[in-house]
């Protein structure tokens, strides 16, 4: 029987500022780096071995994995980076503070954008301040869109 271990990246600068992140590439905070080290220590303590390593192409995920691998003394393993594993694209919400967004649009609407399966957030427009900093033709995703992006990669490469 095979096991799949999923690890979320450590705290990022946007997490700390309570901003929607999605495809925007932000660095880990010092706390995020420590969280990744702690994940590595726990994996080591539990004596978990991996055959394959996968990560999104986002810096916060890649750096978290690299920190974990350093703790495990496995820095020379092959890492499979794939944009298909990137976090959900938050579209026009990218970079906005979550609390301010709730004040502006209301808690109910923000929950719809965040939690409904098939309703995406507002799409990222061409004049969005982060548009030129994100290398993607995707302008925003519902959870369904994200699922449909991730699952073909998962079924072909990971499963």
Segments and roles (model prediction):
Residues 17-19, 113-136:
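Short, basic/glycine-rich phosphate-binding loops at helix/coil junctions
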Residues 39-125:
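Phosphate-coordination/substrate-recognition cap region in phosphate-metabolizing enzymes
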Residues 11-67, 71, 134-151:
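Loop-to-helix element that buttresses phosphate recognition and phosphoryl-transfer chemistry
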Residues 154-159:
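Short, intrinsically disordered, charge-balanced linker/junction segments flanking boundaries
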Residues 106, 151-152:
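Disordered, low-complexity tails and leader-like regions
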Residues 1-5:
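Extreme N-terminal starter segment of soluble prokaryotic enzymes
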Residues 102-110, 130-144:
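A short, terminal or domain-edge coil/loop segment
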Residues 8:
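Active-site beta-alpha turn of Rossmann-fold NAD(P)-dependent dehydrogenases/reductases
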